[in-house]
């Protein structure tokens, strides 16, 4: 209710309201959490079907967005209903226009999650197409992403660092991301893929300034935060975003 009042009445927040108002719903079967919602482009949204976001919640949200006319294409990813994969952003987050950090077993491995492309026309579902994985589904929408492995090539480190929010990054801008410093194998993998690694203290003190065109991982301490289930993207609510130049 507090957030509802802020977004509705605060003078510094120019909001058109809510696509889905959870305080108005009395159904336990209609639930949505932000970690399952990834805005990939201004015309494409990805949603996780998880233990926290239900099928009815997804249907309600897609319909509400499509009725406003902005987005007609959705990718729905069915992820395991478990504590380790509580949200979609625990197994995949965007880190640049053309790359993402993934948890390999569930995105490219033998147990990769199914994905569905849901297309709306004239505010109605026109077609639903199933794909064997999320990256395959995204390619059909012109988004061919380069995956960077959480935990690197070692399966044990993949499991360990995914548990500690190693695939959960908050993008300050395309190529400028914030993540936990304790996920060292993931940071090493990002470095191999062209990311410069700096600390949050260096950025705050202006010892290091983020440069346009230079992919950069800003690391912060947060072992207790991830231990409690929080990731950098999980705990961030962007209030104002500039448009991305695709």
List where the protein language model places each region.
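The feature marks the mature, well-folded catalytic cores of soluble enzymes
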Residues: 1-246
